[in-house]
């Protein structure tokens, strides 16, 4: 059976743990260990600009002994009038996996519905599951066991990071809180899915408009840009509601004394996070960015071994 990774709950708790364990192993020996069997080609398609996703996937595939074919959709027939389904059928004859950074989640779902190779969500408007695998790897490195930790996210609760942290976090047994202003809350269907998964793992889901309450005693504090790609023209009116949710030294002081800070990047310093926090001793941002490489390599190996 072909396994896809389109959203965080595509992995069971046990499967997520397997991927994270493999990511830790690959990080110990990132170059010489090349576990892909035979020549492997991977299509890496971008509808949106990228730094970390492009470098980490392209280099990671090479380190595994595979070959990445990296294109932007505008340079293919996908950017014109060929259907997603036709593109998926053709690419499935050429490559062993498809990695796609795109807009609506429905585009990934449509491609996966006919692809005969694994399809990986490298970011959509709704989810960012590869990033959250890297986040979980980083948390495990700093904190040890994930189960029972308290993670609080601050900012736009309706964006892809909030959604993926909800699903991926509770899958790992983490208690996840989303602190966001009214009008920017998680999608109800995503929250419901996270609550169902949390029942299986002993985790919990909390959504609040009180940033201070969310920070109190937290083990992990996470934020993301207040203006996602495609929202740049919304102006200052969009930014204003998020000001009380800035991840700054005052908010960090409310958390556990050993708390860590994550940001998937790029950061708008002075908006969602201050320099003092991002560059301070609690920051694990740079480890988090590096772990995109290792977590995605592990995911590719895991999927290809099972497809």
UniProtKB/Swiss-Prot annotation:
Activity regulation, free text: Competitively inhibited by L-norvaline (NVA).
Pathway: Amino-acid biosynthesis; L-arginine biosynthesis; L-arginine from L-ornithine and carbamoyl phosphate: step 1/3
InterPro entries: Asp/Orn_carbamoyltranf_P-bd (IPR006132), Asp/Orn_carbamoylTrfase (IPR006130), Asp/Orn_carbamoylTrfase_sf (IPR036901), Asp_carbamoyltransf_Asp/Orn-bd (IPR006131), Orn/put_carbamltrans (IPR002292), OTCase_ArgI (IPR024904)
Pfam families (alphabetical): OTCace, OTCace_N
Single biological process term from Gene Ontology: arginine biosynthetic process via ornithine
Assigned EC number: 2.1.3.3
Binding site for L-ornithine: 160, 224, 228-229
Alphabetical UniProt keywords: Amino-acid biosynthesis, Arginine biosynthesis, Cytoplasm, Transferase
Protein family according to the UniProt entry: Belongs to the aspartate/ornithine carbamoyltransferase superfamily. OTCase family.
Function: Reversibly catalyzes the transfer of the carbamoyl group from carbamoyl phosphate (CP) to the N(epsilon) atom of ornithine (ORN) to produce L-citrulline, which is a substrate for argininosuccinate synthetase, the enzyme involved in the final step in arginine biosynthesis.
PANTHER family the UniProt entry points to: ORNITHINE CARBAMOYLTRANSFERASE, MITOCHONDRIAL, ORNITHINE TRANSCARBAMYLASE, MITOCHONDRIAL
Summary of subunit composition and partner proteins: Homotrimer.
Protein's recorded name: Ornithine carbamoyltransferase
């Amino acid at each position: 059976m072909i396994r896809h990774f389109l959203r965080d709950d595509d992995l069971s708790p046990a499967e997520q743990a397997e991927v994270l364990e493999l990511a830790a192993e690959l990080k110990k020996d990132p170059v010489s260990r090349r576990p892909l069997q035979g020549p492997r080609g991977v299509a890496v398609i971008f509808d949106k600009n990228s730094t970390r996703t492009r470098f980490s996937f392209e280099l990671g595939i090479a380190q595994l002994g595979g070959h990445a074919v990296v294109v932007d959709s505008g340079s293919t027939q996908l950017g014109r009038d060929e259907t997603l389904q036709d593109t998926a059928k053709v690419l499935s004859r050429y490559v062993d996996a498809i990695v796609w950074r795109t807009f609506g989640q429905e585009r990934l779902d449509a491609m996966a519905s006919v692809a005969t190779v694994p399809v990986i969500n490298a970011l959509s408007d709704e989810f960012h599951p590869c990033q959250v695998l890297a986040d979980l790897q980083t948390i495990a490195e700093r904190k040890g066991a994930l189960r029972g930790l308290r993670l609080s996210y601050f900012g736009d609760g309706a964006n892809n990071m909030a959604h993926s942290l909800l699903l991926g976090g509770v899958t790992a047994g983490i208690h996840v809180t989303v602190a966001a202003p009214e009008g920017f809350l998680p999608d109800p269907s995503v929250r419901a899915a996270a609550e169902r998964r949390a029942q299986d793992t002993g985790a919990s889901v909390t959504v609040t408009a009180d940033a201070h309450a969310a920070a109190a005693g937290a083990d992990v504090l996470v934020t993301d840009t207040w203006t996602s790609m495609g929202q740049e023209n919304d102006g200052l009116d969009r930014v204003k509601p998020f000001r009380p949710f800035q991840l700054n030294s005052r908010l960090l002081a409310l958390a556990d004394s050993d708390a860590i800070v994550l940001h998937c990047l790029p950061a708008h310093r002075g908006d969602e996070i201050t320099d003092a926090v991002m560059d301070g001793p609690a920051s694990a941002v740079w480890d988090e960015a590096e772990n995109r490489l290792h977590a995605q390599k592990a995911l590719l190996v895991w999927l290809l071994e099972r497809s």
